[in-house]
UniProtKB/Swiss-Prot annotation:
Similarity field: Belongs to the small heat shock protein (HSP20) family.
GO CC list: mitochondrion
Annotated transit peptide: 1-31
Official protein name in the record: Heat shock 22 kDa protein, mitochondrial
Entry superkingdom: Eukaryota
SUPFAM superfamilies (alphabetical): HSP20-like chaperones
Residue ranges of every copy of the sHSP domain listed in the record: 94-202
Organism expressing this protein natively: Pisum sativum (Garden pea)
Cellular location(s): Mitochondrion
Sorted UniProt keywords: Mitochondrion, Stress response, Transit peptide
């Protein structure tokens, strides 16, 4: 009885503010902004996307969303990471709509195909190289200009580690058209991978 009276006095005194009655936000969802959502942010007032853990458990693939594959400051990524990110964004409509990525990657039995949106850049602004199975793609507006001129244009950069003995890195093809770069990396055939040299013994 005494405890009941004490509770009534506590409630009537106003000490229990409305903030204590607010429901606690579930830890199963988070709102966040990432670099991969920059283009989405520019076209929407709602800058947050709720991601529910129970829908797709957090794995290493989810960490890839924290920076765009073709962000100038992103670290080198393996090909499997890039393809996994594509699968993750494609399979989940929420993430796919939120990212609006300016790139795509797909792999077939014959080749690897990469597409990068580089608005404002021409083929003279793009450099593609392969060193120790690492494919490097760089694009910089006004890359051919002289050193004296200030360069403050767009920049694109990415490094992708390709698996060894799987792709023909010496016959990579690239095409730049209307601000879109398409890169094709042919695959080796099975007999080409098994590069066995028999040495005759005299």
């Amino acid at each position: 009885m005494a405890s009941s009276l004490a509770l009534k006095r506590f409630l009537s005194s106003g000490l229990l503010s409305s903030s204590f009655l607010r429901p606690v936000a579930s830890s199963a969802s988070r709102s966040f902004n990432t670099n991969a959502m920059r283009q989405y942010d520019q076209h929407s007032d709602d800058r947050n996307v709720d991601v529910y853990r129970h829908s797709f458990p957090r794995t290493r693939r989810d960490d890839l969303l924290l920076s765009d594959v073709f962000d100038p400051f992103s670290p080198p990524r393996s090909l499997s990471q890039v393809l996994n990110m594509v699968d993750l964004l494609t399979d989940n409509p929420v993430l796919s709509a939120a990212s609006r990525r300016g790139w795509d990657a797909r792999e077939t039995e014959d080749a690897l195909f990469l597409r990068l949106d580089m608005p404002g850049l021409g083929k003279e602004d793009v450099k593609i190289s392969v060193e120790q199975n690492t494919l490097t793609i760089k694009g910089e507006e006004g890359a051919k200009e002289s050193e004296e001129k200030e360069k403050s244009g767009r920049r694109f950069s990415s490094r992708i580690d390709l698996p060894e003995k799987l792709y023909k890195i010496d016959v990579i093809k690239a095409e730049m058209k209307n601000g879109v770069l398409k890169v094709t990396v042919p695959k080796m055939k099975e007999e080409e991978r098994n590069n066995v040299i028999n040495v005759k013994v005299d």
